[in-house]
């Protein structure tokens, strides 16, 4: 499938997968991509499948002229769902933000390296 930006979706998916464990292929749609990051475990005592995490998720869409994006912050709960929630604790906030910034830099670099190059534009 060719995207509005002129890039094949399969090639973009391969490139996005190479960015790390962020892309959630099952939650992507035709021109929309979903990324997330489980940055900080809330409590390591429960079994791994029952743990909750503080982190971020990103909705990215190919609009043709650019990729529009919107980040959200919150809690990844025991049911495997994101809930937009205020992150607690200065150290936790820093870790989540640092993880997001590191990813964003790599994403921007990847999009600029495409031929034709693409840019990121925050959704208003």
From Swiss-Prot:
Keywords from the named record: Activator, Coiled coil, Cytoplasm, Transcription, Transcription regulation
A matching Pfam family: Crl
Where is it located? Cytoplasm
Query: Can you list the GO cellular component terms from the UniProt entry?
Result: cytoplasm
- GO BP annotations listed: positive regulation of DNA-templated transcription
Q: Where is this region: Essential for activity?
A: 99-118
Q: What is its main location?
A: cytoplasm
Coiled coil location: 90-115
Q: Which family does it belong to?
A: Belongs to the Crl family.
Function comment: Binds to the sigma-S subunit of RNA polymerase, activating expression of sigma-S-regulated genes. Stimulates RNA polymerase holoenzyme formation and may bind to several other sigma factors, such as sigma-70 and sigma-32.
The protein here is known as: Sigma factor-binding protein Crl
Tell me what organism the protein belongs to.
Answer: Pectobacterium atrosepticum (strain SCRI 1043 / ATCC BAA-672) (Erwinia carotovora subsp. atroseptica)
This chain is encoded by the gene named: crl
């Amino acid at each position: 499938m060719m995207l509005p930006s002129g890039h094949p979706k399969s090639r973009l998916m391969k490139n996005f997968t190479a960015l790390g464990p962020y892309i959630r292929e099952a939650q992507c749609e035709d021109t929309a991509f979903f990324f997330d990051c489980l940055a900080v475990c809330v409590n390591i005592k429960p079994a791994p499948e029952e743990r909750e995490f503080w982190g971020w998720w990103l909705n990215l869409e190919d609009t043709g002229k650019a990729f529009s994006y919107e980040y959200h912050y919150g809690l990844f709960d025991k049911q495997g769902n994101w809930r937009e929630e205020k992150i607690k604790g200065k150290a936790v906030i820093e870790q989540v933000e640092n993880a997001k910034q590191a990813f964003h830099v790599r994403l921007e670099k990847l999009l600029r390296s495409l031929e034709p190059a693409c840019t990121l534009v925050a959704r208003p």
